[in-house]
Structures are given as structure tokens and as C-alpha cells.
Amino acid sequence: MTELISIRESSKHVDEEVRMHVWLTDKRSSGKIVFLQLRDGTAFFQGVVRKNDVSEEVFEAAKGLRQEASFYLTGTIHEDARSHFGYEIQISDLEVVSNNEGYPITNKEHGIDFLLDHRHLWLRSRRPFAIMQIRNRIFKATVDFFENEGFVKFDAPLLMHSAPEGTTELFHIDYFNHDAYLSQSGQLYGEVGAEAFGKIFTFGPTFRAEASKTRRHLTEFWMMEPEMAWMHQDESLDLQERFLSYVVGQVLEHCEYELSILGRDVDKLRPAAEGNYTRLSYDDAVKMLQEAGKDFKWGDDFGAPDEAFLSEQFDRPFFIVNYPVAIKPFYMKKNPENPLTYLCADVEAPEGYGEIMGGSEREADYDTLKAQIEEAGLNLDDYSWYLDLRKYGSVPHSGFGMGFERVIAWICKLDHVREAVPFPRMINRMQP
């Protein structure tokens, strides 16, 4: 019986007859030959139907196929150096499953709003396919890395009574006559996991009610957040560098085809896989901006243009360390060498992409953390359970968070993070 294979497996079956189930993305004919552009969820390639090699019924069926028709085919795999994928199939038989007309996403140019309105169909196209395959590889690399480092996957709740960074940018929910919020971070609960299991990472959706229309913001996005007991800030930075360089290396190794679809210059990514990330102090970053004539003073937070300028000065990700206390959340540990700053760091991606990760050593002392909660104007009762972590067996500990879509946007060189998630949620979009 002829073997059923995926397009991705074609290289293992050159000059063999195989079966596939596929969808049609495009078609053209020239008299006695029909060229079919095919996809199956693993890759895209071309099928060729020659009138002299098939029955009249099969040839007419091929000519009558419409965009996104689904069908089974039988044929022989051949190498094809002209294609991204490197192979094509000479079709000898096909069996149509569905063949409706009127598919809305044709091969002409469409505006972004039209494509997002039809996101449920747009995901079938080459570009979204490549991005989602790279997203999947980054997820796999993330899980593999932390499992190999001895971390435990830990699940944080999405409904929260209190928030790690205040409630001004949270979605409020009436929870049986009580206030609740959609989580903007699993970090506080991640710290619980770290003191139970030593090293954990959370991964899941987070929500921020930011009225922002920038290319870097979504209202629903995914975060990966490790927390590590017995780890100081410098050790955390070492871990972050190993992690990010591993992820980029895995994408370069396994996603060459997808990166080629996107036209990504992989030479721009290779330095990130090598490590050796600069650790730039906040003070020095301020000086760089000022020397470039930017209107920026010590104590300001970096805006997107500032981050873009700084990231263009490096060929790989880099850290900005020790931010002022006034512009960071309450749970961070103060820098003993300068108590006006925290032991914290953001990771900035090159090529103008800016912040993709952020973390800190956490404040481990009960009285100090309590004072910082009060200074932030937060209700101590909401954080009583969090303070318990410092009351019973507190240890030095650190953690960080990675914005999944921002990393994908940088690696894929996307203009907007909305392309980095299957169904983007923004202030003006909740469907499909």
C-alpha cells in the first residue's frame, strides 16, 4: 500500500510513490500541464499534473480545483532546486474532498485590517504559517531548556485578588461581589513555587489594560516567567543569557525553511546565539542617550524610541541593569551599592526591537518588603500571603519574565507583535 506522508517528509521519499492529504493555495496551467501550489500544515510545495501521464478524469479534476480545495493525492517525489522547500510531486491521481469557491484571501494585496478580520483563514498562508512554526519552536526550546536545567513547570492562576505591579493597567472583574483582576503576571505565585520546588517557570497568557496602539503592545499576550530560590542577580543574568542564546540557536537549527519564507537575514541572528551579552548600567545608558542629543534625564524610564536607539548600537541582545527605584515595582531588592536603584535588569533585543525580557533579584527581607509595599501605596492585607514567604524560610531569590510575542517579533523581524500570536487582542480588536 502506498505510504501516506507529510510534505515535510518528502526528502525521505525521493523517487518514491506516496500519498498525501493537502490543500490548494494557488494554481496555474499551461495547456497540458497544471501546476498546483500545495500545503498540508507542515510545509508548502508544488504538485504537477501532466495530461499525458494521468487519466482525463484526473486532469479535469486538477483543472477544476479552486483555492483552498482539499484533496488526497498520489504521486512521485522529485527534487526541485527552484523551490524554498527543495522538492515537488508529480501527481498521478487525486481524490477531491472539498472544492468550494469564493475563498476571500486571494493572491492579490490585502490590507492588514482585512487580513486580521479573516485571521481564521489568514493563518493558512505562508507568512503566518512560518511565524507560528517559529513560535512553536521557541516554545519547545523554552520547555527543553528549563527542564534540562532542573526547573519545574508551575501554573499560576489567571484570576487574582492582588497585583504585582498595582491595578491601574488591569482588567477588573466582578467576582461574586468581590473585586478580581485578570493576571498581568504570574510572578508572585512563581515565587511561591520557587520556595517549594527550588526552581520553577510559569508560562501562560497575561492581560494588561493599556490603551496603547504601539507595535509592541497587545492587551492579551503570553509570558514565560522563571523564579529561582538561592539565586542572586548576577547568576540570574547568566541564566538569562544561556536561555536566550539557546532559544535563538534552536530556531536557527530547526527553522531554516520558515526563516527563508520570511526573508529573515539569519546572519543578524547568529550573534544572539553566541552569547556574550553586554551588561550596560542604567547610568551608562542615560549617558549614551544624552551624548546622542536625546532629551533624557536620570530617573526617566526608557520609551520605545530610546530603547530602539540603544538596541541599534549592539549586534546582539544586551542587558540594562540597575534601574532607579522610582520606575520599577515594589518587590525588587535595592542595590547595596546605590540604594536609589534596584538589582534589576531588562534584556534589549537588537535591530531596534527593544525590551524583550525583564527581571530582578527579589527583596527577601520581611520588614523591607513590607515597607516597600506601603511606599507603593498598596494594601498590606492583599499581600499578607506574599509576605509570609519572607516570614518563613526566606532565602535570596531572583526571577525574570519574557514577553513571548516580543521575542517572536524580533526573531522573525515583524513590524508588529500582532503577527506573533494566532489571534491578537488589541484595544480595537477582539475578533475573530
UniProtKB/Swiss-Prot annotation:
GO terms, biological process: asparaginyl-tRNA aminoacylation
Recorded superkingdom: Bacteria
CDD domains: AsnRS_cyto_like_N (cd04323), AsxRS_core (cd00776)
Molecular function via GO: asparagine-tRNA ligase activity; ATP binding; catalytic activity, acting on a protein; nucleic acid binding; transferase activity
Top-rank EC class of the record's enzyme: ligase
Record keywords, A-Z: Aminoacyl-tRNA synthetase, ATP-binding, Cytoplasm, Ligase, Nucleotide-binding, Protein biosynthesis
Compartments reported by the entry: Cytoplasm
InterPro entries for the chain: Aa-tRNA-synt_II (IPR004364), aa-tRNA-synth_II (IPR006195), aa-tRNA-synth_II/BPL/LPL (IPR045864), Asn-tRNA-ligase (IPR004522), Asp/Asn-tRNA-synth_IIb (IPR002312), NA-bd_OB-fold (IPR012340), NA-bd_OB_tRNA (IPR004365)
PANTHER family membership: ASPARAGINE--TRNA LIGASE, MITOCHONDRIAL-RELATED, ASPARTYL/LYSYL-TRNA SYNTHETASE
Subunit: Homodimer.
NCBIfam families per UniProt: asnS, PRK03932.1
Assigned protein family: Belongs to the class-II aminoacyl-tRNA synthetase family.
Protein name per Swiss-Prot or TrEMBL: Asparagine--tRNA ligase
Organism ancestry: Bacteria, Bacillati, Bacillota, Bacilli, Lactobacillales
